[in-house]
Amino acid sequence: MARLAAFDMDGTLLMPDHHLGRETIATLARLRERDITLTFATGRHVLEMRHILGTLSLDAYLITGNGTRIHSLEGDVLHRQDLDPQVADTVMHHAWDTRASMHVFNDNGWFTGQEIPALLQAHVYSGFRYQVIDIKSIPAHQVTKICFCGDHDDLIRLRIQLNEALEERAHLCFSAVDCLEVLPLGCNKGSALAVLSNHLGLSLADCMAFGDAMNDREMLGSVGRGLIMGNAMPQLIAALPHLSVIGHCGNQAVSHFLTHWLDNPHLPYSPE
């Protein structure tokens, strides 16, 4: 039986309205009753995740910023990785040929250069929001990650520009169809989960993980049991064809799967 369960948030544990369903919350509590350690592995900021955790009365480790930070149950930093300052400086100051909006993250919060109210819909559960600022004024040595939000085709073209400018100095990935992330080289949820597993005296084979986007690829591909959401990006399903696909986040598919796993561990699972 798995001893550590890792959950992506958006498109996985959260429903389409960005809330946690009652069944999901109850199932997470059942895992803790079985002494299974929980970790939420997300692109969201730790400041936001602490608020969400506080509403759940659950103990969980936090992997945030797509692996740039790991926090203990007590809130202590177990691991941190920032963007190379030269990479951050290049990304923040270059005039990219794109319509996408730029968003910069550091330990103090989420920063962007203009009001984009539509982006706040994903944060209604926590009330977390961006701070409008001149992005070029942010110290490059304090940046954890940078992301661009916009049309997918535009972001694909932007990724080509970023790859040419940054070469092998950063890790680029899509955390959603409309969100392209610039992360520290070698930084992803999978590498962070490996650090956490080692800290807990476990191996990745002792873990199960759930996700729906390309920023979940390394995590899902490295654990003992990786499970892909039915609403996942097609690229993720194609990249990990050997993994099982469960149901849709709107139907609380993670809870559905885990309830079956807890009650009938030796029987085959069907998402129907």
Curated annotation (Swiss-Prot):
Its cofactor is Mg(2+). It comes from the Bacteria. GO terms for molecular function: 4-amino-5-hydroxymethyl-2-methylpyrimidine diphosphatase activity; magnesium ion binding; phosphatase activity. It catalyses: 4-amino-2-methyl-5-(diphosphooxymethyl)pyrimidine + H2O = 4-amino-2-methyl-5-(phosphooxymethyl)pyrimidine + phosphate + H(+). Mg(2+) binds at D8, D10, D212. Keywords: Hydrolase, Magnesium, Metal-binding. It is an enzyme of class 3 (hydrolase). Its EC number is 3.6.1.-. It holds the Pfam family Hydrolase_3. SUPFAM superfamilies: HAD-like. Belongs to the HAD-like hydrolase superfamily. Cof family. Catalyzes the hydrolysis of 4-amino-2-methyl-5-hydroxymethylpyrimidine pyrophosphate (HMP-PP) to 4-amino-2-methyl-5-hydroxymethylpyrimidine phosphate (HMP-P). HAMAP family: HMP_PP_phosphat (MF_01847). This is HMP-PP phosphatase. It comes from Salmonella typhimurium (strain LT2 / SGSC1412 / ATCC 700720). The gene is cof.
